[in-house]
């Protein structure tokens, strides 16, 4: 099995008693099938404003260069890179697109929370005393798309990424609404998928 292969697998799905009763597929037949090449034949091309690369933890699989090459091949005029809470894909995407007419829109899918008061400060002293694993304070968040409109927006986007990772990391980099509003200049905000 190699990356990019498409397989049709026939088998039985049943709980695996050796793996905490997780549902497991026991294959009875595996067949390699051809991967049809996808095309964008639309006369008017769309602009993807919410796109993940492999830099999105647990959500993106596509290498940055492949994503940019596909957008160019399909004749798209622009593409927004919006990984979850990070911006590491930007230089790779920029280098892949710099000899083309593709306009890259740099952004991020953030984890919006309504208030800083939702965040538990300090350490869980009971866990320290009893040597139990500390329980993470589950904070409800909503996803938000943040796009940089200009150079000021890029600086503010970088500030938001830094602040979310250094001050509000709670399993994922959280962004309080008031912090976003403090660094709002040059940014376009939009809704995203459900958290």
Describe every region a protein language model picked out.
Residues 1-195:
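Phosphodiester-processing cores and adjacent nucleic acid-binding clamps
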């Amino acid at each position: 099995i190699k990356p990019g292969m498409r397989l049709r697998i026939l088998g039985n799905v049943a709980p695996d008693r050796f793996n905490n009763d997780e549902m497991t597929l026991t294959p009875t037949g595996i067949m390699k099938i051809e991967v049809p090449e996808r095309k964008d034949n639309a006369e008017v091309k769309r602009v993807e404003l919410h796109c993940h690369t492999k830099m999105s933890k647990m959500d993106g699989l596509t290498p940055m260069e492949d994503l940019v090459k596909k957008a160019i091949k399909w004749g798209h005029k622009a593409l927004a890179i919006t990984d979850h809470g990070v911006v590491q894909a930007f230089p790779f995407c920029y280098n892949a697109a710099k000899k083309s007419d593709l306009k890259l829109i740099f952004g991020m899918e953030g984890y919006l929370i309504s208030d800083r008061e939702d965040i538990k400060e300090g350490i869980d002293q009971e866990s320290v005393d009893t040597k139990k694993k500390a329980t993470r304070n589950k904070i409800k968040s909503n996803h938000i798309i943040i796009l940089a409109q200009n150079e000021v927006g890029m600086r503010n986007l970088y500030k938001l990424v830094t602040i979310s990772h250094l001050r509000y990391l709670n399993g994922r980099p959280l962004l309080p609404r008031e912090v976003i509003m403090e660094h709002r200049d040059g940014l376009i905000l939009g809704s995203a998928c459900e958290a």
